[in-house]
Amino acid sequence: TRLVYSSSPNEFSYRNHDKKENIYDEDMTIIGQYYPKEKNRSGSFKDFHALQEVYYNTLKGDRFGLNAWYIHSNRELPMLTTDYGNESDFENRQREETFRGVLSWDHLRENWKMSAKGGYVHTQMKYDYKRDAGNGVMTPMTRSRSKVNTFYGQSEAEYYIGKEWLFTANVSAHQHFVESRDKNIIRQDGNQAIVGYSKGRVELSGAASAKWQPNDRIGMSVVLREEMYGESWTPLIPAFFIDGIVSKRGNIMLKASTSRNFRFPTLNDLYF
């Protein structure tokens, strides 16, 4: 079990080289300029982290594990160094709460092994931006809320044939649910509107590889991979790798590879 808490007011003085203040004479003529000395007062943070790991080894080639992480963060976002406003006139704050839980199983034998894991991830982000409207009352300008829930599973296997061949395969599945809302959008008619989105998507990934190492100086491998996002499939993605030892003195090696690549837009690209 591990528990970590950290916090800081994050207040410090500094010379702001992104601003220039004018020096005036009695006739209000600029006779000089200088970089002001300021104090950062809006970058405080409070972070709490908790980690719990539990493992059980049967001593017969099987191991079971439980891992859980929790994060709670409350952070102020400081003003820009080019902002000439007063830091007491606004509040810019982001809060995060994340939980990750994983169950795992590892199975080991003389010439093969396999593993499986499944988990759940929950993340909630809250962002608030408030500003003094001039009457001493902090008025909400932005009130953004987002939630991400992900369920996933993964399985891997390795099989050895002698010392020359190694075959591997792995498959993974993710189900994402994303919800984002901004509750402080003012329409032209003066009424408040709630805008955002609620999306879900399944992502699958599978790969298989074969590695051949005829001796201790050279090795070659071929990998085939394919992925699915939503209702679309990527083309088959092949790759070939080769590496060899040119000289054992100094461990000089040569490596070469060729592959095809394909990148699909993630939910982060599309919506976050």
Regions found by a protein language model. Name each.
Residues 1-7, 19-74, 97-109, 162, ...:
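Transmembrane beta-barrel wall of Gram-negative outer-membrane proteins
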Residues 1-7, 66-72, 116-122, 169-175, ...:
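Transmembrane beta-barrel strands of outer-membrane/channel proteins
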Residues 61-64, 111-114, 163-167, 216-220, ...:
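Repeated loop/turn-to-beta-strand initiation elements of outer-membrane beta-barrel proteins
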Residues 93-100, 107-108, 118-122, 126-128, ...:
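Outer-membrane beta-barrel transmembrane domain signature of Gram-negative proteins
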Residues 7, 73, 80, 85-92, ...:
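Short acidic-glycine motifs
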Residues 8-10, 73-77, 123-130, 176-183, ...:
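Sequence/structural signature of outer-membrane beta-barrel proteins
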Residues 74, 124-126, 230-232, 236, ...:
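Surface-exposed extracellular loop regions of Gram-negative outer-membrane beta-barrel proteins
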Residues 8-9, 16-24, 71-72, 79-89, ...:
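Flexible, surface-exposed loop regions and adjacent strand-edge segments
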